[in-house]
Amino acid sequence: MAGEVEGRGCGFSLGVLVTLLVLPLPSLCTLSTEKELHVIKLYEGRMVRYNESRNFCYQRTYEPKWSDVWTKIQIRINSTKMIRVTQVDNEEKLKEMETFNMFDFFSSFLKEKLNDTFIYVNLYSNKTCVKVHLTDTDTYYSVALSRGFDPRLFFVFLCGLLLFFYGDTLSRSQLFFYSTGITVGMLASMLILVFMLSKLMPKKSPFFALLLGGWSVSIYVIQLVFRNLQAICSEYWQYLIVYLGIVGFVSFAFCYIYGPLENERSINILNWTLQLIGLLLMYVSVQIQHIAVTIVVIAFCTKQIEYPVQWIYILYRKIKLKRAKPGPPRLLTEEEYRKQADVETRKALEELRECCSSPDFAAWKTISRIQSPKRFADFVEGSSHLTPNEVSVHEHEYGLGGSFLEDELFGEDSDVEEEMEIEPPLYPIPRSVF
């Protein structure tokens, strides 16, 4: 019984301790909320400089128009030393930050300290506030608000458009497969390292926790690299080249081992994924929400309406062909007639040989009806169906100098001459005037 009471007392003490750590401590170290919060308003094209911790707020003064689809509003903070920047939605959030909280105290150490940062403001946000906290008293910083066309948003929109309309072609391209694999390998090298280490670990090891940590570390490292890319390229370019070479080669090796996608279902999944990413990029890059939704819907309908348009066009062609009057057939020339006759004759003779050589052919019945069985057997074995004498007679009669052609030519000429012959006119004899 005493043990139960003692255990309850320990649990109660632990709960009180956690409550004191998480909840605000107004009696110990709470800043006075009655003190008025000093906030500096930010205006477009105006820069302010300070050397102490301040609170800044920007309030929207105009409604976004259709011409602001790729317009960007950003707050740039540049300082001589490291600072801590926190973005909130309104002034009430700033007042809450002024109140000491143990959870906020520990989480503030996880916030990134930067000396040059950009904060992007939503065009539809009524108010955006920023708190700048100095870690060193001897620090000067400047805050500027700017608005204008962002070429990066337009580039992202074009990339989304390309991925959506050419997703099928890209999903089947080997160049896209290898380039995407190498790029993903360079950006997620930490995750790939964690995956390789998981293969060496026992099956009961906490791999999923390690994988989650790898994702978090990879995202954090990628964020740091992109924010400090210019400094890295100028100061540590040797290490950057070595890193890109090693990681790029390893990524290419992995892509080469597994090879491009060949299964049609896998290609379709990649195609749908690229199209979905393209729609998301188009939606994110356009700052006006209703215009973004309209563009996404139009792009989707345009892509899907391709098949109904093809079906309608095919149906229209069929209806048009049925209703159209048949035109006069084109007559063959003499050369085309001879070629076609030769081809069709050879084809018919081959079919006749195959029919006579088939097991179902009544050979004895056929031989009993023909006059020259030996000639028929030679024909079935591949010999010509005409004798040299028959060929000579045919050429003599129907060749270029044959009698049939001469009769046709001279017969036509005689008919023409007969038609052209005109009887001489008969004039009446005039009477004598005498």
From Swiss-Prot:
Cleaved signal peptide residues: 1-29
Span(s) of short sequence motif Nuclear localization signal: 317-325
Annotated region described as B, given as residue ranges: 326-395
Effect of gene knockout: Morpholino knockdown results in defects in eye development, reduced expression of early eye marker genes rax, tbx3, six3 and pax6 and reduction of cell density at the neurula stage. Co-knockdown of nemp1b and ran elicits reduction of cell density and eye defects more significantly than the individual knockdown of either one.
Stretches that traverse the bilayer: 151-171, 175-195, 206-226, 239-259, 280-300
Membrane topology designation: Multi-pass membrane protein
Region annotation Interaction with banf1-a and banf1-b: where it falls in the sequence: 326-434
Keyword DNA-binding attributed: no
GO CC term (a single one): nuclear inner membrane
Localization of this protein: Nucleus inner membrane; Nucleus envelope
Superkingdom assignment: Eukaryota
Name of the protein in question: Nuclear envelope integral membrane protein 1b
Organism of provenance: Xenopus laevis (African clawed frog)
